[in-house]
Every structure is written in C-alpha cells, then in structure tokens.
C-alpha cells in the first residue's frame, strides 16, 4: 500500500522543459513520464469525430484533446498512481489569424512563422487534462500575446538559436524570445506551458491543496 504520510506526487505527462520548469519554480518536483503519443493521429480522431457530428472542434477542444491523449497514453503504459497522486497532461497552440499553429521544428519554419506573426496579436491556448482517483478535470487557458515587430536579422538569429523549435507558436516568453514579446494579457504561466491557476483549481476540485505537493 502507498505510504499515506508520503508527499503525493504530480506526474507530468510531457517532455516539455518549460512545463517542468514551471512546476519546479512553484515548489513541485514532478515525476516526468513522456507519453510518446501520436499527436497527429490523436488530432485526426477528434476532427473525424466532430465531422461525424456536423461540426468543427474549437481550438480549446483541440488542445484539451491532445492534453488528455498524452495523459491517457501514460496511463495505458501502466503508470501506477499512489493515493493522492495526480497526473497532468498539457498541450499548447497559437491561434494566429484564425489558424492554430504548433511547434515549428526547424529554423526555416521558425523564420516563416515570425515573418507572419511579428507586429501582431495572437492567442496562446493551453489545454490541461488532470487525472486523480479515476476522475478527470479538463480546462483551457487563453492568453493574448502581442508580438514585437522584430527585424529580419533578429528573427534569423532567434531561429538559428534553436530555442523556439520545440515551442508552440515558435516563441518562448521566459528566454531569448522575451525580447520580442511586447506584452501579454492573461496568465503568464499558461503562455510558458502550464497554467498554475488552472492546476490549482483542478486540485481544489479534487479536494486537494496545492501545498500538499510542495516538496522543496
């Protein structure tokens, strides 16, 4: 049996260094379990299901669906959760000019994205799927991001750094990318990858306290 006196764990179903950093800076050392889920296939299933109902999934539905797919994949891989443990899946995408954008993956695509988004306002949407004791809490957080009118030289240098390749929207708020964000309106932790207010709401929904998970 799990030790009832032990600090409960947060298990993070994500390989994102940013999500890990958010939790660590908030006093939590999570257990990281990378899901390996096929995100394209998971998204296509959602689109097909919505089409069968004569509708198109919303951006919030899409990111929450991918977040849950990641967490579910970890559960299906045989993750053993102790009493009090919580599993978190997350996914972020940028809504720009009516189009959802994920990670650029290459320098060339990063340059193309930034040439499109510089000087504009976009919405960074982060979906969360949080599992505890057989129950799910799902929710999304949307934050407005106002991009600077960055020069071609700076865009190319930022792309060459490799930093934004694995980031939704081809930018980071907390590192080099911070030079090119004029301001945000909303939750900064959500832009980085995980909304601490939303996670707190989920824990409270389950009858848990944030401080139960502090382990530093």
Language-model regions, residue ranges each:
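N-terminal beta1-alpha1 ligand-phosphate binding loop
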Residues: 5-28
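Charged, glycine/proline-rich intrinsically disordered loops and linkers
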Residues: 39-61
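Cofactor-binding loop segments of dinucleotide-utilizing enzymes, especially the Rossmann-like FAD-
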Residues: 15, 35, 133
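Glycine-rich, phosphate-binding/catalytic loops in enzymes
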Residues: 28-31, 105-107
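Anionic-ligand binding patches
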Residues: 2-9, 53-216
């Amino acid at each position: 049996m799990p030790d009832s006196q032990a600090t409960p764990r947060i298990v993070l179903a994500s390989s994102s260094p940013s999500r890990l950093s958010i939790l660590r800076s908030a006093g939590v050392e999570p257990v990281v379990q990378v899901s390996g889920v096929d995100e394209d296939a998971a998204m296509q299933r959602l689109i097909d299901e919505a089409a069968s109902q004569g509708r198109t999934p919303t951006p919030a539905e899409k990111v929450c669906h991918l977040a849950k797919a990641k967490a579910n994949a970890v559960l299906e891989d045989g993750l053993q959760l102790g009493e009090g443990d919580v599993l978190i899946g997350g996914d972020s995408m940028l809504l720009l000019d009516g189009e959802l954008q994920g990670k650029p993956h290459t320098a060339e695509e990063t340059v193309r994205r930034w040439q499109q988004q510089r000087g504009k306002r976009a919405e960074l949407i982060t979906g969360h799927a949080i599992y505890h004791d057989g129950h799910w809490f799902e929710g999304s957080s949307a934050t407005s991001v106002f991009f600077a009118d960055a020069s071609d030289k700076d865009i190319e240098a930022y792309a060459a750094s490799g930093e934004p390749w694995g980031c939704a929207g081809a930018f980071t708020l907390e590192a080099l990318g911070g030079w090119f964000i004029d301001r945000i309106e909303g939750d900064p932790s959500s832009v980085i990858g995980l909304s601490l207010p939303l996670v707190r709401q989920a824990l409270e929904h389950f009858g848990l306290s944030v401080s139960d998970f502090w382990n530093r």
